Amino acid sequence: MTTTVDLVPGLITTRDAIAAAYGCGTFQGIEPADEAGKVFVYSDPFAGEEYGYTFDGRAEDDEFGPLYLYTGAGPNGDQKPSGRNGSLLSHAEKNREVHLFVAHGKVPGSGAMQQRYIGQMVLDPVKPYDIRRGPGRDGVMRNVLVFRFRPAEGTTPAWTEADQTPAAAKTTIEVTDPAVAVPAPVVLPQQSGAKVKKTEQHNTSETIADIPAGQRKVLRREGELVRAFAAHLAAAGHKTHSFQITIAGEPGVLTPDLYDATDHVLYEAKGLTTRANVRMAIGQLADYRRHIPGRKELRVAVLLPSKPTVDVKDLLGEEYVELVYQTDHGFVGWPLAYT
């Protein structure tokens, strides 16, 4: 290492400068620097647009705070949680920091790309990545890993409006496998080595939320519920999948939990049987169904881990939403009654 680079959010630098300072490579989007104990991530949303997908960028803040999405490594074929992608997933257990850069135009008088340093990140501890469908460099659709970054504690990210996830150019619907596997949670590492400005915990626009372990358990319970019900349907000879829906003019994608192609039923699962969760599921199904082929004949159902109250059952009935819930002996409410 022949130079030093102070990692201050907002810094404009180059891959070569980072490589010279920390001993990493310069050509890949994910560049581990083993001796320095860091993993450098270079995001370029416009590179994704070249191949027909726009996953990279700052997503809408959720109840846990800011969120940045980043498409994993692998130009063709299904991306795997190994290799360079694995270096992100294992960064906490190996005590490596993750540092995010975004492409920032060309170096004046040169073809080299400038990089703007956003700040130190951690993988979302509830859901480290989503699996999305997108074309490879060869034009063939495949599964891609979309990592979910949160600002590390104490980091004030150097976001700009240009970092927002690009809006989809058109409305599309892509058949996908059901999202039944929940990635293993990632332990949040302690921050060190990056120069950052400490933010107040109540500055919701710029600070990472304290994500409770309970939320992680609910998400895992939801994934296990979908997996069990998909297996139940398969044993009955039913074909299942899900959808990835993009909406023209909007960033991100819609991803219903499970579609029973045999009975033309769309299911939305919840990990807790509460009124709030059921109301959320009703709204999600109302949104999803507008984009599903054969929407007039489509039936929708809520999948729950236990029996809801009588009034919640009545709510579902008034909204013409079917109910299926799990018991020790299987699933009550399935097969659905034909009406």
Where are these regions (language model features)?
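Conserved catalytic cores of phosphodiester-cleaving nucleases, focusing on short active-site segments
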Residues: 229, 258-273
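Acidic-basic catalytic patches of nuclease active cores, encompassing PD-(D/E)XK
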Residues: 195-245
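Interdomain/boundary linker segments immediately adjacent to catalytic/signaling cores
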Residues: 158-217
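Charged, structured surface patches that assemble and position nucleic-acid processing machinery
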Residues: 322-332, 336-339
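Acidic, glycine-rich low-complexity segments with interspersed aromatic residues
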Residues: 2-115
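Compact mixed alphabeta submodule
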Residues: 110-181
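Nucleic-acid nuclease catalytic cores
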Residues: 102, 108-112, 271-274, 290-325
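Active-site-adjacent loop/helix micro-motif of nuclease/hydrolase catalytic cores
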Residues: 273-284
